């Protein structure tokens, strides 16, 4: 049996695999905000990024390691291909964290070896112990992944795992890289690894999976039954293609069905001891933060965190819930932090009252950020009678998105109606040369006119592929949240903003998307799965953060 920590370790890869979702690129401040919230959530490991990808990625991982990595906090992990250049960069990036991990990987399936790496099985058997041993010389906590494990030859997989553990790997990750396997197959694979790898008891078995067939969470739960003790997942299940296993779904499945899973940990079915260290009341806030910052809207019927997750339309269901919530609800909404709390703050409220409420909600803002958030609060309070926690979340999320902005909106003015052509006047500040220009455009509607004017000013060719708007809270004076997605060179960039005026929100969301596009093209990152290992052996960005 593999090394057993006595519970499930939650390894969050939102900032690495999650950010690889189309349009989900994040700047440094956004990554840092998410990392702080993941620490409050109680994840065991934060995979902060792929340090070798670019100087920006290195800096982000390094900053998270120093700011979020604490002695009693999460382990900070970086991803590295099985090459010295990657591993060295990873080590330097995570080095400020008291608890640090290097996560190195290489493919083990024949299809990946032949068509991607151009390597033989013999090559892999030589690379794995050499690179794991090198990583071990730098840090004690080493995770090794067999990429595309679910499509690998089992006997070869066992051999690779045994070599990795002998070389010093403390965690062995079994990825279902393309979301190919089924629950029974994945459970059997974990069971067979436990049976056929002689030194497996020296490492924790981890699983990583994608949701291409909608089976990622089910696969993981079956893996838990067969000995997996670390689950690699993302907030809202974001990730490449159809996404990753969803953290909130996994955690709440283990929470709600604890009596069922307890037996697989040799516990009494009625044992009250939690199966994870997650503070479930932080789930909803974490979900909303990630959604706001990535611009990836959560589908309404998404389990646990969707807008309809605790809604009842049927009269029979409504009647039952009113009599006893347990008739149709298996989770108390408060367990995941869902609350309709309203705060009695208005335009006469002071900074200390706003700060106190933000601290109660888990936000720890610097003096400068608090001043900016308070200014936004006062502006909103002039236009909205009641301020809710959701409004404050929107204000803070909006503030986090401001850094690394080439373009800033100075003015938006729109004229429209059923007897006139929608016309927008936009003034845009270019922060790089501190110049401001104004443009006027006509569109099919007010938002189209705004986007046309912004494109004239920004001169960044793109295609608008999605526009969506929803209210943050109830009422005619509610904040409107706008999400915009644009495309350039087959890459997607998202922007998000909230305002009581949805046209202003749309303008800011579009500018956010443009800023992400510009930032991403400057960043010029490489992808961990699509570059040859040879590219990283001799090219290393030493201290790119300086």
UniProtKB/Swiss-Prot annotation:
Domain called Pyruvate carboxyltransferase: residue spans: 8-271
EC number: 2.3.3.13
CDD domains: DRE_TIM_IPMS
Cofactor: Mn(2+)
Keyword Transmembrane helix among UniProt keywords: no
Catalytic activity: 3-methyl-2-oxobutanoate + acetyl-CoA + H2O = (2S)-2-isopropylmalate + CoA + H(+)
Location(s), subcellular: Cytoplasm
GO CC annotation: cytoplasm
Database matches in SMART domains: LeuA_dimer
Region (Regulatory domain): 408-546
Residues binding Mn(2+): 17, 208, 210, 244
An individual GO BP term: L-leucine biosynthetic process
PROSITE patterns named among the record's database cross-references: AIPM_HOMOCIT_SYNTH_1, AIPM_HOMOCIT_SYNTH_2, PYR_CT
Pfam family, one: LeuA_dimer
Molecular function as annotated in GO: 2-isopropylmalate synthase activity; acetyl-CoA C-acetyltransferase activity; manganese ion binding
Family as reported in the entry's similarity comment: Belongs to the alpha-IPM synthase/homocitrate synthase family. LeuA type 1 subfamily.
Subunit details: Homodimer.
Function: Catalyzes the condensation of the acetyl group of acetyl-CoA with 3-methyl-2-oxobutanoate (2-ketoisovalerate) to form 3-carboxy-3-hydroxy-4-methylpentanoate (2-isopropylmalate).
Protein name from the UniProt record: 2-isopropylmalate synthase
Organism: Prochlorococcus marinus (strain MIT 9301)
Gene for this chain: leuA
């Amino acid at each position: 049996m593999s090394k057993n920590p006595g519970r499930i370790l939650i390894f969050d890869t939102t900032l690495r695999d999650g950010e690889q979702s189309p349009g989900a690129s994040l700047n440094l401040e956004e990554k840092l905000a998410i990392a702080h919230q993941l620490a409050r959530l109680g994840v065991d490991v934060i995979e902060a990024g792929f340090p070798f990808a670019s100087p920006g990625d290195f800096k982000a991982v390094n900053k998270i390691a120093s700011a979020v990595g604490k002695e009693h906090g999460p382990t900070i992990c970086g991803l590295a291909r099985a090459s010295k250049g990657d591993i060295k960069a990873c080590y330097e990036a995570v080095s400020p964290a008291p608890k640090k991990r290097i996560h190195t990987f290489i493919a083990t399936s024949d299809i990946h070896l032949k068509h991607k790496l151009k390597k033989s099985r013999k090559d892999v058997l030589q690379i794995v112990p050499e690179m794991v041993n090198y990583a071990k010389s730098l840090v004690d906590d080493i995770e090794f992944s067999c990429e595309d494990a679910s499509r690998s030859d089992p006997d070869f997989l066992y051999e690779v795992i045994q070599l990795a553990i002998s070389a010093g790997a403390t965690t062995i990750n079994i990825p279902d890289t393309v979301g190919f396997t089924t629950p029974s197959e994945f459970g059997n694979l974990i069971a067979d690894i436990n049976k056929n790898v002689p030194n497996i008891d020296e490492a924790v078995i981890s699983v990583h999976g994608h949701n291409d067939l909608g089976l990622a969470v089910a696969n993981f739960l079956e893996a838990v039954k067969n000995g997996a003790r670390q689950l690699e997942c993302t907030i809202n299940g974001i990730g490449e293609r159809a996404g990753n296993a969803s953290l909130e779904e996994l955690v709440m499945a283990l929470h709600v069905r604890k009596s069922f899973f307890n037996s697989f940990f040799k516990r009494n079915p009625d044992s009250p001891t939690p199966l994870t260290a997650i503070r479930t009341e932080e789930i909803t806030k974490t979900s909303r933060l990630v959604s706001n910052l990535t611009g990836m809207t959560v589908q309404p019927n998404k389990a646990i965190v969707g807008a309809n997750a605790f809604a009842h339309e049927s009269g029979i269901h409504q009647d039952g819930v009113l009599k006893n919530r347990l008739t149709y609800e298996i989770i108390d909404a408060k367990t995941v932090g869902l609350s309709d709390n309203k705060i009695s703050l208005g335009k006469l409220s002071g900074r200390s009252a706003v700060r106190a409420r933000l601290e109660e909600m888990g936000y720890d803002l610097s003096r400068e950020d608090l001043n900016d958030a308070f200014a936004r609060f006062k502006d909103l309070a002039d236009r909205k009678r009641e301020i809710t926690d959701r409004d404050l979340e929107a204000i803070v999320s909006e503030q986090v998105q401001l850094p690394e902005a080439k373009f800033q909106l100075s003015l938006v003015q729109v004229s429209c109606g059923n007897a006139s052509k929608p016309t927008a006047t936009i003034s845009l500040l270019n922060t790089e040369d501190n110049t401001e220009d104004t443009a006027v455009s006509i569109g099919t509607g007010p938002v189209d006119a705004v986007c046309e004017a912004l494109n004239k000013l920004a001169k960044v060719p793109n295609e608008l592929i999605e526009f969506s708007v929803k209210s943050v809270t109830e009422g005619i004076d509610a904040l409107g949240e706008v999400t915009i997605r644009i495309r350039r060179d087959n890459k997607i960039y998202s922007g998000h903003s909230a305002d009581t005026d949805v046209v202003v929100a749309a303008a800011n969301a579009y500018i956010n998307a443009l800023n992400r596009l510009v930032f991403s093209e400057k960043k010029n990152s490489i992808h961990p799965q699509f570059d040859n290992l040879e590219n990283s052996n001799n090219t290393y960005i030493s201290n790119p953060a300086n």
